């Protein structure tokens, strides 16, 4: 089966420079890679690699003047020797480009697609193939598939040259020199020549017979004379067709007729050239007469079609001497082809052997150059001496240059016949792959399926590989490489097609690492043997331009391949300075004889052998003592000391198991493992010695069981006594740096590698359950709401709500008790408190994410986590804040539900409870009595008998955010009781602004002296809800009798706003919505007092007279104080003279009573002087 992609040597290889970290190393040994590079093998050593027996055949195509070679490399010796081609008579320049082996008998087919030879100075390319037996020592067969014999096609060519007068002698001579040059260069070919000069007439200078007799161009044209007349081109062409191409003049009936016309001007005659329709006509126009497009088009009528191929315009005669090279190409097309198809090749450039494959002794080779590079493949006979060509059917123009046969690969089957896939990577620039059915009983090949590429220039079909995944003899997968595919910064793609009943169908694809747009992933694809021991074939894909090259390993799986590589090997990992690593790959043999598969990888001037490592599985066992952890030993207890609790002993055992049955060597694995306690928890429940949560150890493991003991203890307090303690084990292979990988140095101790599965194990140590003899705890939970602490929820800016819940466990221990509380979105959870018992029973709540804010919110509480013991009861208080802006109804409904992990479904009836709390909306009403209310009224016998009074009230209603719930309001106006007796009567009415009708209601209440302001009647008035309302209580007071005695009493009115108190409440208390006006009424009694006034006047006059007489008698009216004071003003400095003193003394004697105070003053002054 074909093992790797074939690449044309001329294809340029470009490398990109990108960085990518190495992939995991499963399971090829990179560090133990062995390199082979024989001296003088050339840079293309490693172009193809093929494992045969216990060695590797390496192809080294030639470069420059060197020839290609085959080398046989032995892994045991480390040397490569060239393969001797005994009996070969050919020089193989590109031997080693193609290698294939037959998996049934190990025979080897090596081909050189560049066997070249010259035929009439034209180069033919075909193939040269050698068939070897497995040991390369047996008889060798050689063959030349697609070999095309040099069949000389007969061509009779006539030069028809212009001899008109417009030609100068030197120009005419250059035409003759051109004809001589052509004849000399084609002298040893199957061409015959004749020459005719034309002007007004026509002259045969020499015919075909003359040329056969004497093939000397100089002698044949020695006596030519320039005619110097007109240019009758039409007549000249007809003359050649009828008079020159004649058998009696040497023309051959089987020869192709060719006419080359050389002229410097337009025709001077007219007509047609129907006689020359079977002649291939080239016309060469020379000179200044053909500078315009119109003049050039006059030549088209003389030439064959298409004119672009058969008309040539030259501006000077000097360019005639350089025209032969172009003319030779056109002549080459003619020679050896049929007259019906003058522009195609058959097998002349077949390059047969560019690809090859062998299966069940049946060999095929690709022939990309056949049929004008439409391509195809050759079915070789057993002796390689005969072949059958199979190509595109039908052979249409669009299949040309498709390169069918660039790759070929057998797709074996358990049936008698198999399929063959052949790639055409350049078909319509998209590429395609054709599937052919092998002929049965000497029949014909048949095309059964076509698979098309999808991206221009991707070289889809540039590499093919069939894969028998389960090794049952039936090819399940066809891998098609597109190494130039580009997408997502990845260069190259491999498409996976799976076999169906009617053909192959695309199922997936493989990709290389990103960052290598020119990496050519898929340049080489090969089906490896089972290298990882799972019984399925693995696949290697080369990407030679990812950095210095890379090889990807894809493991087989049932029904296909793993989409992710198990290993990516970079060339620099195996050898410094390597280039094109991964250009070819083959890995189906055990070269070392150790039972492990080896993979050969080609690079530039290198061949690398990578050994696979034995794949092992790790068997682990773990045991504990005690098997269950006693709860009473580790549970939280506040009466015990802080001493460490008893621990658990662990025994862990390891043993390796080989997954490669044929490997018989000794297995020793250096294992690194980690033990971890409760690794998924932040708070661990077990500690290794030293307070650590994990242990790391190394151990050498063999195929025998190895065991180790450990122990761990518990912290002071373990709260979670339900979930088992997890003991996790993680392990991996550990290799010391510098560990030798040379198996010859290590003997049979080849370092194994673990199977790429989850390298971890987890065990659980359960806690002992105190649930009776059946070891099964059955809880019975009950939840109920206690009488609400808040009888109603009053919606204010800072309102809160508290509810109480009672939770009980009536049966055995309950595990992971969870209390869920659903409440409306207007409430916001604040906190939870444990009311009773006052012990360390943990409770924690968290609000769950809202599923829909329009429905409800939920609270989840863990109670006594993790165990709620049997017979326990708790009382919880849940406190909520209110979100005033929320939408509220008439009540708040809270629903509680309690669950646990071990309650029977038949006991869930009392696990739910619901409470409903009414909602009261706030009303902000303020009532004030006005200053202009009548507060005092007085009645007198002579005063007005009727008084009009007013009691004024102002009602302010503040807007609320709950205006959607506006209550029905009513103003209740109380007026005084009607008098039962007395002279004063009163009547009352109510007016409101805005006006509303009021209903009068008599309370029929008797007057009560102790409660004088109790209303005797009520006015009930509906209130229009607005911010300000004015209420006037108007009264008429009338004096209807005589005032017999004075009195004073009070008349009171009142105003209050009433509403439905079951839905609303006063925001600032009921007093704010109540006002009262108290008015004092004064009744004054007046008696008849005229005679009393007369007698009082007379008595007053008599008293005044008596006072006057008394004053007169005492001399009050005779005093001369005025004169004395005026006399005193005449004394200087205010000091009386001596005469004055005497006068004063006399006066004092006459008026002792009036002057005594003055004398006392003087005596005091005098005394002061003494």
Curated annotation (Swiss-Prot):
Transmembrane spans: 1091-1111
Binding residues for Ca(2+) 1: 468, 470, 472, 476
Region named Disordered: 1128-1170
Compartment annotation: Cell membrane
Binding site for Ca(2+) 3: 590, 594, 598
Glycosylation sites: 65, 89, 188, 649, 670, 726, 730, 862, 885, 897, 1060, 1071
Extracellular side: 26-1090
Bilayer topology: Single-pass type I membrane protein
Subunit-structure text: Heterodimer of an alpha and a beta subunit. The ITGAL alpha subunit associates with the ITGB2 beta subunit. Interacts with THBD. Interacts with CD226.
Protein name as catalogued: Integrin alpha-L
Native source species: Homo sapiens (Human)
Gene transcribed to yield this protein: ITGAL
């Amino acid at each position: 089966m074909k093992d790797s992609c074939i690449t044309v040597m001329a294809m340029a290889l470009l490398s990109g420079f990108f960085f990518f970290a190495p992939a995991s190393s499963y399971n090829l040994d990179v560090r133990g890679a062995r390199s082979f590079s024989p001296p003088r093998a050339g840079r293309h050593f490693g172009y193809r690699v093929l494992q045969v027996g216990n060695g590797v055949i390496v192809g080294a195509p030639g470069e420059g003047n060197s020839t290609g070679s085959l080398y046989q490399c032995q892994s045991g010796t480390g040397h490569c020797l060239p393969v001797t081609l005994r009996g070969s008579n050919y020089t193989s320049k590109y031997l080693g480009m193609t290698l294939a082996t037959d998996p049934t008998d190990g025979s080897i087919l090596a081909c050189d697609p560049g066997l070249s030879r010259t035929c009439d100075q034209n180069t033919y390319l075909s193939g040269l193939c050698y068939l070897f037996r497995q040991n390369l020592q047996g008889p060798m067969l050689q063959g030349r598939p697609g070999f095309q014999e040099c069949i000389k096609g007969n061509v009779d060519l006539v030069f028809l040259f212009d001899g008109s007068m417009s030609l100068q002698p030197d120009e005419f001579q250059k035409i003759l020199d051109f004809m001589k040059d052509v004849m000399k260069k084609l002298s040893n070919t199957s061409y015959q020549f004749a020459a005719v000069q034309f002007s007004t007439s026509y002259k045969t200078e020499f015919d075909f017979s003359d040329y056969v007799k004497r093939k000397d161009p100089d002698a044949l044209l020695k006596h030519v004379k320039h005619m110097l007349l007109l240019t009758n081109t039409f007549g000249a062409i007809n003359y050649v067709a009828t008079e020159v191409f004649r058998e009696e003049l040497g023309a051959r009936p089987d020869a192709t007729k060719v006419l080359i016309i050389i002229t410097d001007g337009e025709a001077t005659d007219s007509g047609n050239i129907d006689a020359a329709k079977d002649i291939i006509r080239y016309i060469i126009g020379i000179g200044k007469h053909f500078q315009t497009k119109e003049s050039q088009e006059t030549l088209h009528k003389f030439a064959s079609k298409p004119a672009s191929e058969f008309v040539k315009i030259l501006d000077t005669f000097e360019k005639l001497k350089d025209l032969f090279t172009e003319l030779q190409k056109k002549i080459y097309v003619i020679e050896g082809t049929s007259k019906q198809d003058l522009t195609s090749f058959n097998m002349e450039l077949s390059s047969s052997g560019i690809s090859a494959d062998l299966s069940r002794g049946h060999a095929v080779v690709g022939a990309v150059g056949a049929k004008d590079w439409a391509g195809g493949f050759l079915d070789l006979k057993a002796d390689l001496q005969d072949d059958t060509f199979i190509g595109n059917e039908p052979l249409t123009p669009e299949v040309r240059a498709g390169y069918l046969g660039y790759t070929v690969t057998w797709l074996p089957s358990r049936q008698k016949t198999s399929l063959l896939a052949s790639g055409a990577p350049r078909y319509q620039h998209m590429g395609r792959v054709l599937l052919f059915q092998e002929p049965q009983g000497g029949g014909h090949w048949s095309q059964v399926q076509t698979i098309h590429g999808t991206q221009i220039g991707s070289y889809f079909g540039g590499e093919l590989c069939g894969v028998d995944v389960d090794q049952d003899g039936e090819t399940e997968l066809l891998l098609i490489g597109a190494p130039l595919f580009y997408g997502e910064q990845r260069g190259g793609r491999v498409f996976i097609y799976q076999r169906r009943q009617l053909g192959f169908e695309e199922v997936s694809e493989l990709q290389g690492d990103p960052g290598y747009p020119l990496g050519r992933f898929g340049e080489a694809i090969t089906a490896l043997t089972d290298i990882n021991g799972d019984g399925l074939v693995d696949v290697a894909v080369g990407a030679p331009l990812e950095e210095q090259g890379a090889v990807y390993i894809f493991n087989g799986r049932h029904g296909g391949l793993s989409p992710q590589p198990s290993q990516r090997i970079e060339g620099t990992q195996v050898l410094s300075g390597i280039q094109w690593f991964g250009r070819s790959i083959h890995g189906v043999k055990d070269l070392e004889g150790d039972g492990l598969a080896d993979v050969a990888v080609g690079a530039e001037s290198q061949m690398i052998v990578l050994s696979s490592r034995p794949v092992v599985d790790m068997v682990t066992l773990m045991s504990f003592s005690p098997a269950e952890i006693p709860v009473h030993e580790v549970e939280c207890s506040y009466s015990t000391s802080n001493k460490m609790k008893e621990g658990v002993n662990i025994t862990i055992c390891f043993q390796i198991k080989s997954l490669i049955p044929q490997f018989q060597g000794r297995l020793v694995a250096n294992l690194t493992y980690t033990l971890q306690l409760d690794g998924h928890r932040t708070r661990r429940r077990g500690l290794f010695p030293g307070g650590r949560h994990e242990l790391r150890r190394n151990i050498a493991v063999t195929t025998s069981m190895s065991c180790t003991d450990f122990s761990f203890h518990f912290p002071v307090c373990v709260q979670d006594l339900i979930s088992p303690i997890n003991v996790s084990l993680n392990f991996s292979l550990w290799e010391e740096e510098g560990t030798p990988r040379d198996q010859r140095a290590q003997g049979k101790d080849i370092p194994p590698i673990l199977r790429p599965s989850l390298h971890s194990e987890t065990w659980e140590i359960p806690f002992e359950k105190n649930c009776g003899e059946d070891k099964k705890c059955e809880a019975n939970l009950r939840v109920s709401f206690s009488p609400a602490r808040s009888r109603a929820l009053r919606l204010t800016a800072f309102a809160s709500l508290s509810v109480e819940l009672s939770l009980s466990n009536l049966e055995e221990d309950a595990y992971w008790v969870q209390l869920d509380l659903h409440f409306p979105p207007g409430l916001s959870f604040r906190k939870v408190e444990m009311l009773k018992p006052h012990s360390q029973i943990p409770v924690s709540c968290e609000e769950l994410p809202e599923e829909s804010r329009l429905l409800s919110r939920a609270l989840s509480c863990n109670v006594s986590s993790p165990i709620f013991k049997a017979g326990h009861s708790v009382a919880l208080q849940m406190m909520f804040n209110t979100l005033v802006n929320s939408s509220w109804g008439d009540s708040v409904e809270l629903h509680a539900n309690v669950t646990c992990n071990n309650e029977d479904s038949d006991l869930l009836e009392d696990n739910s409870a619901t409470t409903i709390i009414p909602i009261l909306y706030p009303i902000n009403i303020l009532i004030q009595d006005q200053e202009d209310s009548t507060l005092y009224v007085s009645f007198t016998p002579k005063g007005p008998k009727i008084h009009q009074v007013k009691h004024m009230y102002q009602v302010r209603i503040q807007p609320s955010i709950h205006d959607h719930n506006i209550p029905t309001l009513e103003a209740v106006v109380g007026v005084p009781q009607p008098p039962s007796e007395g002279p004063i009567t009163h009547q009352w009415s109510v007016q409101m602004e805005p006006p509303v009708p009021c209903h009068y209601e008599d309370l029929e209440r008797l007057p009560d002296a102790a409660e004088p302001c109790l209303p005797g009647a009520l006015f009930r008035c509906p209130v229009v809800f607005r911010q300000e309302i004015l209420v006037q209580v108007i009264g008429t007071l009338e004096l209807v009798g005589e005032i017999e005695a004075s009195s004073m009493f009070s008349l009171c009115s009142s105003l209050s706003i009433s509403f439905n108190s079951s839905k609303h409440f006063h925001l600032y208390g009921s007093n704010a919505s109540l006002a009262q006006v108290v008015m004092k009424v004064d009744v004054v009694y007046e008696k008849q007092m005229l005679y009393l006034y007369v007698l009082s006047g007379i008595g007053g006059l008599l008293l005044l007279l008596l006072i006057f007489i008394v004053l007169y008698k005492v001399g009050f009216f005779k005093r001369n104080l005025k004169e004395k004071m005026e006399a005193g003003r005449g004394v200087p400095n205010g000091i009386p003279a001596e005469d004055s003193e005497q006068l004063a003394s006399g006066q004092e004697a006459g008026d002792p009573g009036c002057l005594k105070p003055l004398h006392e003053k003087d005596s005091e002054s005098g005394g002061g002087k003494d």
